[in-house]
Amino acid sequence: MSFALAFPVFDPVAFAIGPIVIRWYALAYIGGIVIGWFYARALIKNRRLWGGAAPIPLIAWDDFILWVTLGIILGGRTGYVLFYNLDFFIAHPIEIIELWKGGMSFHGGFLGCVIAVLAFGWNRKLPVATLGDLTCAVGPIGLFLGRLANFINSELWGRPADPSLPWAMVFPTGGPLPRHPSQLYEAALEGVVLFVILALMIRAGALRRPGLILGSFIGLYGVARIIGELFREPDPQLGFLWGGLTMGMLLSVPMVIVGAIVAARAWRRAPLTASASAGHT
């Protein structure tokens, strides 16, 4: 017997102010950046987490937000163009700048963030590993909101599920088959679980080992994404790749390896002392 749920009807527009229309996906980006900004400021101001003053000044973090926002948007769009739909955008290059139609890649956005961290850190002569730690500490917030927006938009739905699965759902654009609400799985794994793990690590003193949160985020996100991809329908223009893998899996495997290496190296280094971590607030 089928118990598939009907997908709830959501308006893709969160709200409108005159001619200005704000969609849920845009609101997720805005919310993730703003909430993440405040959360990172709280981490910077908590001297106990650093064993002294944080190596990143508050004013520097405030300036960095613009850099990382550009990295997320430009990197996310570039990654989607290159990794997921290159042939289409070669034929329709003008659509590359039409961001309101959707099409962003986490892996591209992450690379954009890496470039922003490196460029800003070197420009301001700040510890790049610590800047990366702060950026990755807030990352799950945006991931959680972004996956909820994917669900609201009825996009990136899951693979067909057993009709007896209590939470199997029929999506408006997914045909008649009940499917896994994989967006919610990913919101839980990439957002809630990853945030809790990193928060517990920070509470235990991980910020005193520059690069530990950075490496842990990279590796754990890769694991979470690979698990999520097991339930997510592959992008139709790509389908399954070698050995039944998806593009998301292929892009995430290197993250697991790189993350483990970065975290291991950070763990082997001696933790910051009060004098070594002294910075500005």
Curated annotation (Swiss-Prot):
A 1,2-diacyl-sn-glycero-3-phospho-(1'-sn-glycerol) binds at residue 147. The chain crosses the membrane at residues 24-44, 56-76, 102-122, 126-146, 187-207, 211-231, 238-258. The gene is lgt. Catalyzes the transfer of the diacylglyceryl group from phosphatidylglycerol to the sulfhydryl group of the N-terminal cysteine of a prolipoprotein, the first step in the formation of mature lipoproteins. The keyword Flavoprotein does not apply. The lineage of its organism: Bacteria, Pseudomonadati, Pseudomonadota, Alphaproteobacteria, Hyphomicrobiales. This is Phosphatidylglycerol--prolipoprotein diacylglyceryl transferase. It is a multi-pass membrane protein. One of its GO terms (molecular function) is phosphatidylglycerol-prolipoprotein diacylglyceryl transferase activity.
